[in-house]
Amino acid sequence: MAKLDVFDIKKAKVGEIELDDAVFNDDVREYLIHEAVKIQLANRRQGTVAVKNRALVAGSGKKPFKQKGTGQARQGCRRAPQYPGGGVAFGPQPKDYNLSMNKKARKAALRSALSMLYKKDAITVVNSLELPSIKTKAFVEVLTAFNLDKTLVITDTATPTLELSARNVKHVKVLGPEGLNIFDIMKYQSVVFTEAAVRRVEGALQS
């Protein structure tokens, strides 16, 4: 069974934690990770971009001049794309970019991503992330103690002290276990869990 040391916020070892191999030491299926990230990013798209075509732009539908006898190319109306102020030809219209992935595959992708981080030794477990007060400096000192830079923090309980202390720190994101997602796991170079958060994630990702 996979194991990790448990530290306090000053990086003093306070124990060990056994990890569920099915969650943190599973086979890494990169194709599933890629698919899950692609779907999450696609589902973020608003798809509301739109331009006016010749049917929507304001203006008369009257023929600008007669069909024959002027020596000019025939024209249908002033709303045509070749005219200034005319409609756009083949421009973007609202579109639904949403894709779906079944729950079993989503969980498998998250397990693969966490297993990849575990095998890279990029997971840190702490007994608690309670800070005495809201101070960005105190949170930065915790990151410095663990030599962490681009970090995703998963904490078991909503702690305004931690969230407010971390808010102004670049390349750091604080989430609860229910907010754990494939894009953020892959975006950040390391993940810090509290002990309780590890257990909640294991419970949520059981196959």
From Swiss-Prot:
Q: Region Disordered: start and end of each range?
A: 62-85
Signal peptide: which range, if any?
Answer: none
Listed A to Z, the keywords are: Ribonucleoprotein, Ribosomal protein, RNA-binding, rRNA-binding
* SUPFAM superfamilies noted in UniProt: Ribosomal protein L4
Its function, per the record, reads:
One of the primary rRNA binding proteins, this protein initially binds near the 5'-end of the 23S rRNA. It is important during the early stages of 50S assembly. It makes multiple contacts with different domains of the 23S rRNA in the assembled 50S subunit and ribosome. Forms part of the polypeptide exit tunnel.
- Please state which protein family the record places this protein in: Belongs to the universal ribosomal protein uL4 family.
Protein name in the entry: Large ribosomal subunit protein uL4
Write the gene name. Answer: rplD
